[in-house]
Amino acid sequence: MSSRREIRWGIAHIYASQNNTLLTISDLTGAEIISRASGGMVVKADREKSSPYAAMLAANKAASDALEKGIMALHIKVRAPGGYGSKTPGPGAQPAIRALARAGFIIGRIEDVTPIPHDTIRRPGGRRGRRV
């Protein structure tokens, strides 16, 4: 009998737009959310929500909650707005990943799950565009 403890895995969902960075840590099925944090929860000024520093603080907050609940290893899913929005993650994605790695998690795989259309998307505003 080995006395080795089972490593509990989780998934870190990072949504990084130009305006904010949202972090959600869930179990492997994605059904149970273990911890949540965002750039807007950790800074006072609205203009700092999207900053790399806010993303780092949010990742540290989510990481400490997840470590308390026994998650020891993470798979990371990074997402940009996608669709008719930006297809590249915002400025907070890289610092959030780095902060999770420094928090002591074992990092499994990192994948990009940005929704990318295969034909085209009809932009909002209708045929004649947005009238200002």
UniProtKB/Swiss-Prot annotation:
Located on the platform of the 30S subunit. This is Small ribosomal subunit protein uS11. It holds the Pfam family Ribosomal_S11. One of its GO terms (cellular component) is cytosolic small ribosomal subunit. One of its GO terms (molecular function) is structural constituent of ribosome. PANTHER family: 40S RIBOSOMAL PROTEIN S14/30S RIBOSOMAL PROTEIN S11 (PTHR11759). InterPro entries: Ribosomal_uS11, Ribosomal_uS11_archaeal, Ribosomal_uS11_CS, Ribosomal_uS11_sf. Belongs to the universal ribosomal protein uS11 family. Part of the 30S ribosomal subunit. The keyword tRNA processing does not apply. It comes from the Archaea. GO terms for biological process: translation. Keywords: Ribonucleoprotein, Ribosomal protein, RNA-binding, rRNA-binding.
